[in-house]
Every structure is written in structure tokens, then in C-alpha cells.
Amino acid sequence: DKTTDMVFYVESEEEVTELIRLAEEYDVCLIPFGGGTSVSSALKLPDLETRMIVAVDIRRMNKIEWINADDRRACIQAGITGKQMEEELAQHGYMVGHEPDSVEFSTLGGWIATQASGMKKNRYGNIEDIIENITVITPRGILEQTEPTTRVSMGMRPQNLLFGSEGNLGIITKAVVRIHQLPEVQEYASAVFPTWDRGVDFLHDLSRTNYVPASVRLVDNIQFRFGQALKPHPEGLKKVMASLQKFVVLNLKGLDPYKMCAATFVMEGEAREVAYQKQNLLQLAKQHQGIAAGPENGKRGYMLTFAIAYIRDFLSNYHIIGETMETSVPWSKISEVCQVATDKLLELHDKHNIPGRPYLSCRIPQIYHTGVCIYFMFGMYMKGID
């Protein structure tokens, strides 16, 4: 594989401007780099590129330039990570609420360039809903709005071209984002369903209500069992309660441990709002044969999300290669897409004579009016495979 010839660490817009000028003068290819968490191969260097390639690391441009509490806006440099941004805003009582799985390492500029979506988009929106102004430096100058605007109804907004641009139009240096006051209450909840299809039906009905929580996720049976296997061994009273809960679910309710799936929820806002959401969504789950599984399981499910990348890196030491992929699917095609993806992976696994059996699981991390996002995780044992 090709590698970059040089890496530049920029600390200001002046340095970015000068670097772009030099790149144009000497015919050098620049590739912006943020957290490096992209899974779309956008950072893979083009095989046919013959120019010198320079990676431009923007992570030193990581400051919050200003906060406007009255208008609930903040101007933030593009190299800041999600984790740092939320920690610094929280010191002033604010948050952005954009929380992709990669929030620990991914950057604001990267979110814009990849048109990212966060797990709490139901409450705070996707990145295109959060951003009100973008500053991007191009070979022909700086592109930005004169002032951030709440909404524009006349003419085109050039900044909209930057969402999903993957660094092809210039280097994003900062953005004005919408901020929110820290929520009064944050609660987790969870529910288990007898089958994946039951869980999907629940999500479909939930999407048509007025009590959709900040985040809702549905994991299939394989991912559910994987999460259960990683749970710490309970002791004392927790051990008794865990055994009792397991007895109720498997014996009294009759759920099959090899078919059941689980949904997890995050609710944020005022206490009354959160209580309303929790009561109604668990009642709806019950109508779909769902069983409330408690806040701790909900919280653990979300914590596992952030641990997956570390688990993947750990398993690579033992020749197990893991990866993820996701796609948007209309409600009517969910089961079909999951089945086709499973069949295709098994087919390719056999075709290339890879040992063992692949791990493949899926989850629905986001719901929309017309469909969902399906997130696939797979792993294969690759020892001895070139």
C-alpha cells in the first residue's frame, strides 16, 4: 500500500493557507487528517496518484474560539475531538450532543467531511443540523458565510457542499455549532424481545410516536450474547438478582436465549419529559412482547459501543480481524438486507477458504421516518491467510 511522503501539523489558518499555496505551486497532493476513525476507506491513498502526498494533521487546531450563550452558538476549531469538545463545553454548562461511536477520537472537521451521524441524533440532529457556518480554505481562498444563520431560504448555501466532501474541496478549519444546555436528567433503559422481528416491529411503531428518546438501539441475538459474555461476574446481592432476572426471562416468560434480542435507550431532558418517554416506550415494548431489562443493562450496552474498537485491536493480536459497515435501509427491507448480507459473507468466507466460521452480527443504531441505519460487525480468523 502507498504511504504518505510527509506529515504536516498545522496550528493556524495562516499555516493552512500557506501550505495550500505551496502545494499548488509544487504540485503536491494534500490529504486532511483528523482522528483517523473513518471506515469508508476515504483515507486510503489513491493507487494512481503520482504526486508527492502530504497528510495535513489538524488536531492541533483544537480550541473553542467563542461561546455565545444568548444565541446558543459556539465557534470551534475543526481539529478538536468530540470528547475534548464536550468536556470543555460542559465547564460552561453546555453540550453539542453529537455522539458517534468514535466520539473519543473523531474530530469536528471529520464529522463535517464525512457527514457524520451521532447516536443521539433524535434529540440533537445529525451533523448537518448542528452546523451553522463552516470555514474551509481552498486553493482559491477562504469559503465561509459572513455570519452564521439559523436558516436561509434564498439561494444556495455553498457550505452544504462540504458535508460528505471527504477533504476534496479544501481543508476545514473551524465551524459554528449549535449548543444546548446540559440536560437536567439522563436515564438509561433496556428491553428484551423474543425475536429480532418483534424488536424491529417495536422500533417501527416507536418511530411514529412523540416519545422517541435521544437514542434507541436494537441488537440482534449474536450481539446480545456477545455483550452478555463480556459482563462482569456478579457477586452478592447482584448475583441473586441476576439469577432471578434470568429465571424470569427464560423460564416464566419463555424467551429463547438463542433467538431473543435487546433494545437499549438513552433519554435526556427535563425530568418530566424523560419520565414520559420512559413510561410510554416501555409500555409500547410490552405490547410487542418486550420485557423491561433495567437501566444498568441499557448503560452497559452503550458503554460496550465505545469498547468495541479496543476489543477489535486486542483480538488482532490473535489473528482475528474485525471490521464494521453500515447502510441505510427502508423499513420494508430490513430483514431482507440482513439475510442477504449474512449469506454473502458466508459465501465469500467459504470461497476464500478462511478457517473457522465468521462472526457476523447487526444492530439498528438509528431510526428515521422512512427507514433505519443497519450497522454490521464481522470478524474472521486470518492466521495463515495472505
Q: Which sequence ranges carry the predicted segments?
A:
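Short, well-ordered beta-strand elements within core beta-sheets of diverse protein domains
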Residues: D5-E11, I179, E187-P194, F265-M267, ...
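Glycine-rich N-terminal segment of FAD-binding domains in flavoprotein oxidoreductases
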Residues: D1-R59
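Beta-rich nucleic-acid/ligand-interaction surfaces
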Residues: V39-S41, F105-G109, F224-R225, Q245
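Short glycine-enriched loop/turn motifs at secondary-structure junctions
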Residues: K2-T4, N68-D71, L182-E187, K259, ...
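C-terminal substrate-recognition/cap domain of FAD-linked oxidoreductases
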Residues: D1, V200-D386
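FAD-binding subdomain of flavoenzyme oxidoreductases
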Residues: N62-V219, K231
